[in-house]
Amino acid sequence: MNSSCEKIFGVLRSPRVSEKSSRLQEISNVYVFEVSSDATKIDVKNAVERLFDVKVGVVRVLNVKGKSKSFRNRGGSRSGWRKAYVRLIDGQSIDVASSV
């Protein structure tokens, strides 16, 4: 693999499939991805455009805080992660299930 492919797969970790993401995908053409913690909006936009051959309109990125959990009276927490909402230009779509 060349370095550009490694960078793309380093930025996009996986698509997030949930009820909310499915609803956003159907209604407003928005796709949700888990991305690396140091990825910027520009990195995410370039990675999605190159990997799926689509045009991206808007990218919104947010950090999800890890949940506090306890097990047998011992405290701990899950790791936090970063999520990106990617809106495509009208008329374009991604088949997330078969592409990644």
UniProtKB/Swiss-Prot annotation:
UniProtKB keywords: Ribonucleoprotein, Ribosomal protein, RNA-binding, rRNA-binding
GO cellular component, one term: ribonucleoprotein complex
Pfam family, one: Ribosomal_L23
PANTHER family reported in the protein's UniProt record: 60S RIBOSOMAL PROTEIN L23A
Domain of life: Bacteria
Coiled-coil region list: none
Subunit field text: Part of the 50S ribosomal subunit. Contacts protein L29, and trigger factor when it is bound to the ribosome.
Gene3D superfamilies: 3.30.70.330
Protein name, as recorded: Large ribosomal subunit protein uL23
Listed GO MF terms: rRNA binding; structural constituent of ribosome
GO terms for biological process, alphabetical: translation
Keyword Transcription attributed: no
Chaperone keyword on record: no
Primary role: One of the early assembly proteins it binds 23S rRNA. One of the proteins that surrounds the polypeptide exit tunnel on the outside of the ribosome. Forms the main docking site for trigger factor binding to the ribosome.
Cross-referenced InterPro entries: Nucleotide-bd_a/b_plait_sf, Ribosomal_uL23-like, Ribosomal_uL23/eL15/eS24_sf
Family that this chain belongs to: Belongs to the universal ribosomal protein uL23 family.
